[in-house]
Structure formats: structure tokens, C-alpha cells
């Protein structure tokens, strides 16, 4: 399996796969469950980050099991989706952003495979946290389809499950954050540690607290995701055939890459 999709809020079924079966993978960090099917004659994995019925909150997702399972299945490329709030007035609800950097404001998560001992003490380079090759494919595909997708944006990850305060949003904006969400860290970190190419499609569902004129709710997030779901599916469907079979990026050469 070369490619896997990780679906965020509102994306519990990619709607593009045929001959689907469920696969449970046992890892040193617990079990991970994903759907495996076929698209364009190729086996593709789909993993709903929050579970099929959105029962797992962001701070309880077993990120290590999920990423380890993908590595065990020989996945090389990951296309992830995420619903986000926007702190940037240029990024409006309904827009897509192909993320290229992050800020980490999480607090309690286990965010590395390198815990010392057998894995050693490793300091992985994060100069390029997201795969530029996947990012380019996504941006070019969106342009071809006429889908509004911003090329680059900084994702600020908070602990959740509560939404952020207006003061926190002002801080994030001053530090350069364009988007705010609750799931991308440690997911992108772990993917990088095991040498996976990782691309994130962020869909703006609301303006962040203190910017939005209305109180925030998860129902609003799901409503925008539902309205824009076809564009998201089209973007993923059309991007997959354009992903080169040979990796020409440096993702597989991440310093201290762990062997599964």
C-alpha cells in the first residue's frame, strides 16, 4: 500500500474507494483500524482519525498507533485532512489551505517515537515538516479544478477539546499562526519520524474566537465540511493519480528515522 488518507472532522468515509474491507493492525502502541480499498487500480488506505462515528476527541487520538500501523502497511505517502479555524483574514470559511508549517501548543500528548532506550536520543530535523512534493501536487490539482486552495499556511495546534479564547487567538496570530486546530500535532511529527511523506489539506470552517461574530460550535464545523465535502473529495481523487511513484523529496531521509 503506497498511499493512505487520514480523515478529520466530517471526513469519515472518502467515498472514492471500491472493494473496501476493514483492517485491524496491532502495534506496540495499541490497535489501529482502517479501511482498505481500491482507487485507480491501486490499493489505498483510509483512516478516520476520530473513529467512524467521531467518538474519539483530539487529545485522546492514538496518534502513535495510527502512524505506526501505516508504516507497517508499507505506506509511503499520507494525505491528511483537517477542519480548522482561521486567524488570517485572507483565509475564509470554505477555503482550503495546503499547510506548510506548524506551531505546537499541545500539553499532554505523547508526541514522539524516540523515548530513549533502544530508539536512542534523536533530534529530528523539522525544517520542512510537510512534504513539498505532495504540497505541490495538491496546489496544482486544486488550481486545475478551480478549487480555492492557498499555497502555504501555518497551523497552530492546541490541546482541545475546548475551542480557543480570543486572547489565545491574538497570541497565535502575533506568532505567525494562520490556522488553528486540535489534531495535526503530533500526527505530522510522528509521520516525519518514520520517514513518511505527509501532506495536510486544511479546510477553513470558521473564523477563530474573537474574530468570528458568533459563538463557535462543532455543529458549524460539520456544516461547512458537509457543504464543501464534494470539493474535498474531488481534490483528493484528482491528486492521487498525480502523486509520483518515485519520491523525489527528502521525507524518507528524516534524521533518526525509526525502522518499523
Curated annotation (Swiss-Prot):
<feature type="binding site">
    <location>
        <position position="182"/>
    </location>
    <ligand>
        <name>substrate</name>
    </ligand>
</feature>
<keyword id="KW-0808">Transferase</keyword>
<protein>
    <recommendedName>
        <fullName>Probable 6-oxopurine nucleoside phosphorylase</fullName>
        <ecNumber>2.4.2.1</ecNumber>
    </recommendedName>
</protein>
<dbReference type="InterPro" id="IPR010044">
    <property type="entry name" value="MTAP"/>
</dbReference>
<comment type="similarity">
    <text>Belongs to the PNP/MTAP phosphorylase family. MTAP subfamily.</text>
</comment>
<comment type="subunit">
    <text>Homohexamer. Dimer of a homotrimer.</text>
</comment>
<feature type="binding site">
    <location>
        <begin position="206"/>
        <end position="208"/>
    </location>
    <ligand>
        <name>substrate</name>
    </ligand>
</feature>
<feature type="binding site">
    <location>
        <position position="183"/>
    </location>
    <ligand>
        <name>phosphate</name>
    </ligand>
</feature>
<feature type="site" description="Important for substrate specificity">
    <location>
        <position position="218"/>
    </location>
</feature>
<keyword id="KW-0660">Purine salvage</keyword>
<comment type="pathway">
    <text>Purine metabolism; purine nucleoside salvage.</text>
</comment>
<dbReference type="GO" id="GO:0017061">
    <property type="term" value="F:S-methyl-5-thioadenosine phosphorylase activity"/>
</dbReference>
<dbReference type="Pfam" id="PF01048">
    <property type="entry name" value="PNP_UDP_1"/>
</dbReference>
<dbReference type="InterPro" id="IPR000845">
    <property type="entry name" value="Nucleoside_phosphorylase_d"/>
</dbReference>
<dbReference type="InterPro" id="IPR035994">
    <property type="entry name" value="Nucleoside_phosphorylase_sf"/>
</dbReference>
<keyword id="KW-0328">Glycosyltransferase</keyword>
<dbReference type="GO" id="GO:0019509">
    <property type="term" value="P:L-methionine salvage from methylthioadenosine"/>
</dbReference>
<dbReference type="GO" id="GO:0006166">
    <property type="term" value="P:purine ribonucleoside salvage"/>
</dbReference>
<comment type="function">
    <text>Purine nucleoside phosphorylase which is highly specific for 6-oxopurine nucleosides. Cleaves guanosine or inosine to respective bases and sugar-1-phosphate molecules. Involved in purine salvage.</text>
</comment>
<feature type="binding site">
    <location>
        <begin position="49"/>
        <end position="50"/>
    </location>
    <ligand>
        <name>phosphate</name>
    </ligand>
</feature>
<feature type="binding site">
    <location>
        <position position="9"/>
    </location>
    <ligand>
        <name>phosphate</name>
    </ligand>
</feature>
<feature type="site" description="Important for substrate specificity">
    <location>
        <position position="164"/>
    </location>
</feature>
<dbReference type="GO" id="GO:0005829">
    <property type="term" value="C:cytosol"/>
</dbReference>
Amino acid at each position: 500500500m503506497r498511499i493512505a488518507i487520514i480523515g478529520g472532522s466530517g471526513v469519515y468515509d472518502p467515498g472514492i474507494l471500491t472493494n473496501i474491507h476493514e483492517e485491524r493492525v496491532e502495534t506496540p502502541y495499541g490497535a489501529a483500524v482502517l479501511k482498505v480499498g481500491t482507487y485507480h487500480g491501486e490499493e489505498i488506505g483510509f483512516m478516520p482519525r476520530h473513529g467512524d462515528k467521531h467518538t474519539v476527541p483530539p487529545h485522546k487520538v492514538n496518534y502513535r498507533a495510527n502512524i505506526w500501523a501505516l508504516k507497517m502497511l508499507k505506506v509511503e505517502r499520507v494525505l491528511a485532512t483537517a477542519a480548522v479555524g482561521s486567524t488570517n483574514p485572507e483565509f475564509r470559511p470554505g477555503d482550503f489551505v495546503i499547510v506548510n508549517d506548524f506551531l505546537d501548543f499541545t500539553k499532554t500528548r505523547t508526541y514522539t517515537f524516540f523515548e530513549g532506550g533502544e530508539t536512542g536520543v534523536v533530534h529530528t530535523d523539522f525544517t520542512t515538516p510537510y512534504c513539498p512534493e505532495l504540497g505541490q501536487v495538491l496546489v496544482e490539482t486544486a488550481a486545475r479544478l478551480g478549487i480555492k486552495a492557498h499555497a502555504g499556511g501555518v497551523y497552530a495546534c492546541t490541546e482541545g477539546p475546548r475551542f480557543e479564547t480570543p486572547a489565545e487567538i491574538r497570541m497565535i496570530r502575533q506568532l505567525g499562526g494562520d490556522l488553528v486546530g486540535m489534531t495535526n500535532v503530533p500526527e505530522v511529527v510522528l509521520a516525519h519520524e518514520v520517514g513518511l511523506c505527509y501532506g495536510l489539506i486544511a479546510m477553513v470552517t470558521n473564523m477563530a474566537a474573537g474574530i468570528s461574530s458568533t459563538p463557535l460550535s462543532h455543529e458549524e464545523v460539520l456544516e461547512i465540511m458537509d457543504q464543501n465535502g464534494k470539493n474535498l473529495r474531488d481534490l483528493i481523487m484528482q491528486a492521487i493519480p498525480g502523486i509520483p511513484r518515485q519520491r523525489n523529496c527528502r521525507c524518507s531521509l528524516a534524521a533518526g528515522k525509526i525502522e518499523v
